[in-house]
Amino acid sequence: MSGVVSAGDTGLGGDPWLAGTGPLTVRTTEVPDSGDVLAGLPEPAVVAWVRHGAGLAGWGEAARITLPSGEDRFTAGEKWLRSAFETTVVTDEVRLPGTGPVAFGTFTFDASCDGSTLIVPRVLRGRDGHGRAWLTTFGPVGTDRVQPERPPAGVRWHDGSLPPPRWEQAVARAVAAIKASDREGGSLRKVVLSRDLYATAAEPIDARVLLRRLASRYPDCYTFACDGMVGATPELLIQRAWRAVSALVLAGTTPRGGTAAEDDALGAALLADAKNTEEHAYAVASMRDSLGPLCEELDIEPGPVLLKLPNLQHLATHVRGKLARPGPGGSLRSALGLAGAVHPTAAVCGTPTGTAMELIRELEQMDRERYAGPVGWMDASGNGEWGIALRCAQLDGRTARLFAGGGIVAGSDPEAELAEAQVKFRPMRNALDF
């Protein structure tokens, strides 16, 4: 079975396993901690989710599905995973979140677009950062031939859908639309605009090289890979460990300073800046409104703090909660279900969602595909972590399509927004053109 479904097909009618042999045996065993789950991955087609050296990395495909477009793509993905996980015979000696069968996913930003994909890797390494490491395998354990890594070479850069001058025009039109809405009593307050950039290398781009470079340079971010989508996102959309849930909301950005004093001054100015704090408040409110009804407890920090990355500072707010107990015969919301419930946040779409989405489609003149959509993993217990696919690129052979953007409010300046987007391209540009 290919695992690829067409519109109108749930993908649940047949055997979800690519081997086509029905239920598979899954085994998770504790192994010595190597200190790096990204070291020595045998092939370029990998899945990964790593932060501070802890996380998951795997290869091969035991099962795969590409979901049809639609608002129900998260629900369809959950149903397919439940069908797959229920037919596995599991031996789990570790019993932590991320052990047993695990699926990785990358979902489209826009429900009207195709391309949301779930992959269950055939081999998966895990490490919790507290001295425990494990290996999960589907079926018999074999020896995978190691394909040598090849760093990108001969990289050439090309403009994407909107070259810089036209993107500045799009930002100006967004600002005008927001101001007009305010004058006329409308509800549009923020829209997030993005642009793309292409890189072409002399040979197919190896995701393993990019992952290691990103993880080394941005340890505070979540370095990820799934179906050719590779990046290092600073934004945790949702994490679920049993009933405990958490998120990290980011919106509002300024550069790092050249000296400690300059850096502190830039950070203080960001915390006091009306445009950026307004943008951040919309993002926090959207998370509260979507996650709050699903929780019996929800704690949101009273004000943003600074998240300092190597090249940028962001306004950040931590959100923590406890899921509401399910009713009779019900079950807790899974990590994937929660990701679907909170996406898209105002941090990547705008306020209100529907109006902002319409303006994005009008002004960006491109398909974001899976940029700014949920990316992450979920295990058979429904635990998992999903980030927002930012600071990333979609790999396709010798080509990489990079994305970056920012939140536009009434006080936004097109030239400043372009400069911010250029800085947000830097992690992937540096990883590709080391």
Positions of predicted regions on the chain:
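Contiguous alpha-helical scaffold segments within structured protein domains
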Residues: 2-33, 39-40, 51-79, 140-176, ...
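An anion-binding catalytic pocket shared by soluble metabolic enzymes
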Residues: 58-65, 114-123, 195-282, 293-299, ...
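Conserved hydrophobic core element of enzyme catalytic domains
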Residues: 323-434
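Short, solvent-exposed loop/turn elements at beta->coil junctions and helix N-caps
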Residues: 108, 227-229, 375-379
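A short, Trp-centered hydrophobic/proline-enriched beta-strand micro-motif
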Residues: 44-51, 102-104, 189-191, 219-225
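A contiguous, mid-domain pocket- or channel-lining segment that forms the substrate-recognition surface
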Residues: 118-145
